[in-house]
């Protein structure tokens, strides 16, 4: 009985916090499907990540807040391809794919949707279902990040960018090292819209150290110079959190 009572209190506290969250309230007012839109918006505003006319791949897109922001940011220009293992309500101007990014056939469908276009930016909000076992959760998260990096190496323009979500803790240093091996510039990020108590953090990599043939062969014209990378606030991340 005590366990159930405590569980109800925890759930009520979370619900109260969620309802009163200024980003949740703002998302409702501005028509975003989730508060996560403001994480991407903050990163974009600080670092100049997204530009009209870009081709962007949104991994782990459901419920669609990042894709919504991308579509609004790019207006009617460019292309957005959204993928998630969970179904997502359609969004005008967004190609939505349903499937597990870890499956080869799903990656093939994603490549078919690109129709030969090279990608300016890949954003990934993918995260595994957490088991509470730190080493297992870290391994699952690492698998998703590594797949996103591998996809980016094949499809990004030489000066393209990859933004991924990950959790600060076990395995973080290895993934940061992978980014430094892959990209010319790497910035760790903790947007203000990310909850203070959460171990959620982001890594942004820009400029492939070894450009893929796809990017070199398919670029149209001269790519714009990438905006300088400036950390949001501080680069220090909380080691623990929800």
UniProtKB/Swiss-Prot annotation:
Gene3D superfamilies, sorted: Vaccinia Virus protein VP39 (3.40.50.150)
Disulfide bridge map: none
Keyword Lipid biosynthesis attached: no
Cellular compartments per GO CC: cytoplasm
Reaction(s) catalysed by this chain's protein: uridine(2552) in 23S rRNA + S-adenosyl-L-methionine = 2'-O-methyluridine(2552) in 23S rRNA + S-adenosyl-L-homocysteine + H(+)
Residues the record lists as binding S-adenosyl-L-methionine: 64, 66, 84, 100, 125
This enzyme's EC code(s): 2.1.1.166
Active-site residues from the entry: 165 (proton acceptor)
Region (Disordered): 198-242
Any one GO molecular-function label of the UniProt entry: rRNA (uridine-2'-O-)-methyltransferase activity
Superkingdom, taxonomy of origin: Bacteria
Chain intervals with Polar residues compositional bias: 233-242
Family statement: Belongs to the class I-like SAM-binding methyltransferase superfamily. RNA methyltransferase RlmE family.
Listed name of the protein: Ribosomal RNA large subunit methyltransferase E
Species of provenance: Verminephrobacter eiseniae (strain EF01-2)
